[in-house]
């Protein structure tokens, strides 16, 4: 049997990925650490070949070289994390695996995307400390400028921060200090995006391109506390003005056309204002993370594994048939709370009664979890379902921590 190696998958999608791959006649190999999963979720790994979790090309290459028998089984390699497409592309080329198109790897760079569609992104510059001095010509002189600083390749708001640059200080010095204090490995060795801060609603266009046809599944609208996304509504088309939705669709179509992107999903993030929208992250080649797969499945009356099979196999050219989606206007409203705690804590367990909504533990038991507002790594768990049901049931979830039992925090 042909095997598909999956490098990078979240704790929601992993519940369905084995069924998704096997029902198409393939066998999954998961590059994942099962110890990070809670309770019943570990049953997913029974009878499945797992290898260590890799995010580095050299490390994964070394592992595969040392396991020739495993390499002989692998037909294809893919990922559900857009920042890992460069790793997947390099490994596929080195070992001769089938893989998503190479443009997926190039599109993981925010700098590359901004260069393709500059009219659709906020004013921005790509900087690297290794390159020496830099200037930001688009800053407004003589006033305070608010900017967002983030790695050029990355997701989940890791190492993302908002900076207020006073009128009387050197912008480059402020940005250099923030990069050095970011807390990530080798901040001097990577590229960073400095982007004008935009105020508005955080929305994402979910959809895919198949054989040159762009399909928009609908808008997600997310609530944030600081840099943590805490709730997601899907579909949320009715919450955004038609003219702004058209601007969003134009931006996606322009990016697809100019990059020659095809046969893959997208999760394009925008800041939407009452009159326009700015693309802030393209996320090309993958479905939205967190609970998006469950929300699309619920909205469109499809099994999550069916949606995930479409996501995984479309870029690999392994689909037997086209999956048809009903009009978004016929979809039922879904809601997911990506809940947190309001203080740093160690999570011990969850207490969740029988309910209609779908609950997914996210935090690693025994690990210190940061409070809401820091990044998406503050997530404790997710509760997903039809909107009116989730609102009613979220209060039934209880999280046991080193500081006692706590209720979910999501606002």
Descriptions of predicted regions:
Residues 1-103, 386-389, 393-410:
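ATP-binding N-terminal substructure of ATP-dependent carboxylate-amine bond-forming enzymes
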Residues 93-164, 180-181:
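A conserved helix-loop-beta module that forms one wall/lid of the active-site cleft
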Residues 123, 146-149, 163-199, 228-234, ...:
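Conserved ATP-binding module of the ATP-grasp superfamily
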Residues 174-225, 267, 271-278:
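Phosphate-binding site of ATP-dependent enzymes
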Residues 224-233, 289-297:
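A short, polar/charged loop-to-alpha-helix boundary motif
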Residues 237-245:
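A short, structured beta-strand-centered segment in the mid-to-C-terminal lobe
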């Amino acid at each position: 049997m042909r095997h598909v190696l999956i490098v990078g998958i979240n704790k929601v999608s992993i519940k369905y990925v084995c069924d998704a791959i096997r029902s198409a006649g393939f066998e999954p190999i998961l590059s994942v650490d099962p110890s990070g999963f809670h309770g019943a979720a570990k049953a997913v790994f029974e009878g499945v070949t797992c290898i260590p979790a890799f995010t580095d090309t050299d490390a994964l290459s070394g592992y595969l070289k040392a396991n020739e028998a495993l390499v002989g089984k692998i037909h294809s390699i893919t990922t559900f994390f857009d920042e890992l497409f460069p790793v997947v592309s390099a490994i596929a080329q080195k070992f001769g695996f089938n893989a998503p198109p190479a443009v997926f790897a190039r599109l993981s760079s925010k700098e590359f995307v901004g260069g393709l569609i500059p009219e659709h992104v906020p004013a921005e510059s790509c900087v690297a400390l290794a390159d020496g001095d830099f200037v930001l010509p688009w800053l407004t002189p003589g006033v305070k400028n608010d900017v967002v600083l983030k790695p050029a390749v990355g997701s989940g708001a890791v190492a993302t921060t908002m900076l207020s640059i006073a009128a009387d200080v050197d912008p480059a010095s402020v940005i250099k200090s923030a990069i050095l204090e970011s807390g990530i490995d080798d901040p001097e060795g990577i590229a960073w995006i400095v982007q004008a801060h935009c105020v508005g609603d955080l929305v994402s266009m979910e959809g895919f391109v198949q054989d040159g046809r762009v399909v928009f599944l609908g808008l997600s609208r997310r609530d944030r506390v600081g840099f943590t996304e805490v709730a997601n509504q899907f579909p949320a088309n009715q919450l955004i003005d038609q003219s702004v939705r058209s601007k969003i669709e134009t931006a996606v179509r322009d990016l697809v056309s100019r990059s020659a992107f095809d046969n893959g999903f997208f999760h394009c993030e925008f800041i939407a204002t009452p009159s326009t929208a700015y693309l802030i992250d393209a996320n090309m080649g993958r479905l939205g993370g967190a609970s998006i797969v469950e929300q699309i499945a619920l909205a469109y009356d499809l099994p999550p594994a069916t949606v995930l099979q479409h996501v995984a196999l479309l870029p690999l050219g392994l689909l037997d048939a086209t999956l048809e989606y009903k009009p978004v206007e016929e979809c039922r409203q879904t809601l997911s709370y990506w809940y947190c705690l309001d203080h740093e804590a160690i999570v011990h367990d969850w207490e969740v009664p029988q309910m209609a909504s779908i609950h997914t533990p996210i935090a690693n038991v025994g690990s210190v979890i940061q409070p809401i507002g820091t990044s998406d790594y503050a997530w404790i768990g997710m509760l997903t379902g039809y909107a009116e049901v989730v609102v009613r049931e979220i209060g039934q979830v209880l999280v046991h921590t080193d500081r006692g039992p706590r209720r979910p925090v999501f606002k």
